[in-house]
Amino acid sequence: MAISREKKTELINKYARHEGDTGSVEVQVAVLTEDINELNEHLRVHKKDFHSQRGLMKKIGHRRNLLAYLRKEDVNRYRDLIQSLGLRR
């Protein structure tokens, strides 16, 4: 259920702020969003997988906290990120 190494590398390259950047808020949110989307697809098929459902809720909470931090620090970066990821905010 975890995203593939190639997909993760692609996301890191797309959202990195500089060369070698793997930990910026944008990269973390992009990777979490991809993870969340894959877990959503998994849970559509496996409705009673409550362990994965709890993991999904933890990832959503982590992404929410990162987005709140980014919104507080730099609104323009926040708006660009949610627009590029297609998040409803």
Swiss-Prot record:
CDD domains, per the entry: Ribosomal_S15p_S13e (cd00353)
GO cellular component terms given for this protein: cytosolic small ribosomal subunit
PROSITE patterns: RIBOSOMAL_S15
Gene3D superfamilies according to UniProt: 6.10.250.3130, S15/NS1, RNA-binding
Gene Ontology MF: a single term: rRNA binding
Keywords: Ribonucleoprotein, Ribosomal protein, RNA-binding, rRNA-binding
Swiss-Prot/TrEMBL GO biological process terms: translation
One Pfam family hit: Ribosomal_S15
Family in the record: Belongs to the universal ribosomal protein uS15 family.
HAMAP family named in the record: Ribosomal_uS15_B
Subunit structure: Part of the 30S ribosomal subunit. Forms a bridge to the 50S subunit in the 70S ribosome, contacting the 23S rRNA.
PANTHER family in the cross-refs: RIBOSOMAL PROTEIN S15, BACTERIAL AND ORGANELLAR, SMALL RIBOSOMAL SUBUNIT PROTEIN US15M
Task of the protein: One of the primary rRNA binding proteins, it binds directly to 16S rRNA where it helps nucleate assembly of the platform of the 30S subunit by binding and bridging several RNA helices of the 16S rRNA. Forms an intersubunit bridge (bridge B4) with the 23S rRNA of the 50S subunit in the ribosome.
The name this protein goes by in its record: Small ribosomal subunit protein uS15
Organism name: Lactiplantibacillus plantarum (strain ATCC BAA-793 / NCIMB 8826 / WCFS1)
The gene coding this protein: rpsO
